[in-house]
């Protein structure tokens, strides 16, 4: 058998194997969703065989095209191939079908695509997380009860005065009120199959972290904006004293308004300890310039220090745009933790046991007490400030 016939036979056999393996690959994907390692190995071997046969065929074509056997008479590849076939003919009548090696290998599904494995980036890409800051402004405490009661002085009428001998002394008056801060629960849960939690241990820690973050994010909003109705906390903005707009002067900027609010806090005999702003409002204030185009609050360094009028600025999206809160927060309010944020996993929830499901619960219990609401000032920026 001639060299050309041997190459042709090898190519035909490899193509038949490749077709069979492609059929097997399709069947595996439909049944299991993936391709077995053994099948991948077989495909690689057949691919190598086809590559070798193609190389041999190319070399033979070059050899015949160059007329190496008879330098004086160059013949085309088809002529040389015909001569090779005639030499191998045994004199019997028959037909012969010649197939060319024209199946190129590519990355499509019908070719070698299943052999190309995508690179897996480890871990889960997490979205951006908001920095949580409101709790850090407040005093902290722990309680073992479901409610807190405290007595708050409301009005002190101070009539103290100098008194002449034998004269009637003046009487002063103090009014108190009993306040109650009930412990509230913040919670949420997700369900997951036991199989996925067993097969992907990393997923469990990821879910736990996301649940804890979601809890803290809700707490942030409650500490600042809770309206106190139903099971909501009574937040700082709910109990805050309204900003005294009579302090405003013509031409005041937002920075001036914050300065007025700081002064208003001092009227309660306390000192402000922080400023809570929406990030957009802080951005606008930090970029304020004087008449000569110079930055008032330090220019590019303003966002590094987050300081205005000597007080830390707390930019948070929990604060509505156009709203500001200034206060002596550590003296005015206190967070009381009844139960720290915890994560629990249960199989006994509803029909979890028979469905191999897990319920992952995250919750905390806390109360928020406000001792001195006059030390917290809340207001809004005017449209022209």
From Swiss-Prot:
What keywords were assigned to this record?
A: Capsid protein, Coiled coil, Isopeptide bond, Late protein, T=7 icosahedral capsid protein, Viral capsid assembly, Viral release from host cell, Virion
**Molecular function via GO:** identical protein binding
Q: Which GO terms describe its cellular component?
A: T=7 icosahedral viral capsid; viral capsid
Q: Which Pfam families match?
A: Phage_capsid
- PTM per UniProt? The major capsid proteins are covalently cross-linked.
Q: Which domain of life is it from?
A: Viruses
**Covalent cross-link site, Isoaspartyl lysine isopeptide (Lys-Asn) (interchain with N-356):** 169
Family designation: Belongs to the HK97 phage major capsid protein family.
Main role?
Assembles to form an icosahedral capsid of 66 nm, with a T=7 laevo symmetry. Responsible for its self-assembly into a procapsid. The phage does not need to encode a separate scaffolfing protein because its capsid protein contains the delta domain that carries that function.
**Could you give the subunit structure recorded for this chain?**
Homopentamer and homohexamer; isoaspartyl lysine isopeptide-linked. Interacts with the portal protein.
State the name under which the record lists this protein.
Answer: Major capsid protein
Provide the species name: Enterobacteria phage HK97 (Bacteriophage HK97)
* Gene that produces this protein: 5
């Amino acid at each position: 058998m001639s060299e050309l016939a041997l190459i042709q036979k090898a190519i035909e056999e490899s193509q038949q194997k490749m077709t069979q393996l492609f059929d097997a690959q399709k069947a595996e994907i439909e049944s299991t969703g993936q391709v077995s390692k053994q099948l991948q190995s077989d495909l690689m071997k057949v691919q190598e065989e086809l590559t070798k046969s193609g190389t041999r065929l190319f070399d033979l074509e070059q050899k015949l095209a160059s007329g190496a056997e008879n330098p004086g008479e160059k013949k085309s590849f088809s002529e040389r191939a015909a001569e090779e076939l005639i030499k191998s003919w045994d004199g019997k009548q028959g037909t012969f079908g010649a197939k060319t090696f024209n199946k190129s290998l590519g990355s499509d599904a019908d070719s070698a695509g299943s052999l190309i494995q995508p690179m897996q980036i480890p871990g889960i890409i997490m979205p951006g997380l908001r920095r949580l800051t409101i709790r850090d402004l407040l005093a902290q405490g722990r309680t073992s009860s479901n409610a807190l009661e405290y007595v708050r002085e409301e009005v002190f009428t101070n009539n103290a005065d100098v008194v002449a001998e034998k004269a009637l002394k003046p009487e002063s008056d103090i009014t108190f009120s009993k306040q109650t801060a009930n412990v509230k629960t913040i919670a949420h849960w997700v369900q997951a199959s036991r199989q996925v939690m067993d097969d992907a241990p990393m997923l469990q820690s990821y879910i736990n972290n996301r649940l804890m973050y979601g809890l803290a994010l809700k707490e942030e909003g409650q500490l600042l904006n809770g309206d106190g109705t139903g099971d909501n906390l009574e937040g700082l903005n709910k109990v805050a004293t309204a900003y005294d707009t009579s302090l405003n002067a013509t031409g005041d900027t937002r920075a001036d308004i914050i300065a007025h609010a700081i002064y208003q806090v001092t009227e309660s005999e306390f000192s402000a300890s922080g400023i809570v702003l929406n990030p957009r409002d802080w951005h606008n204030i930090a970029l304020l310039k004087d008449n000569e185009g110079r930055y008032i609050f330090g220019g590019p360094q303003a966002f590094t220090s987050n300081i205005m009028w000597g007080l830390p600025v707390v930019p948070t999206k929990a604060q509505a745009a156009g709203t500001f809160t200034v206060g002596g927060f550590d003296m005015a309010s206190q967070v009381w933790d009844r139960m720290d944020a915890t994560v629990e996993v249960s199989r006994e929830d509803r029909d979890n046991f028979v469905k191999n499901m897990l319920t992952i619960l995250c919750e905390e219990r806390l109360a928020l007490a406000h001792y001195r609401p006059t030390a917290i000032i809340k207001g809004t920026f005017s449209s022209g400030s």
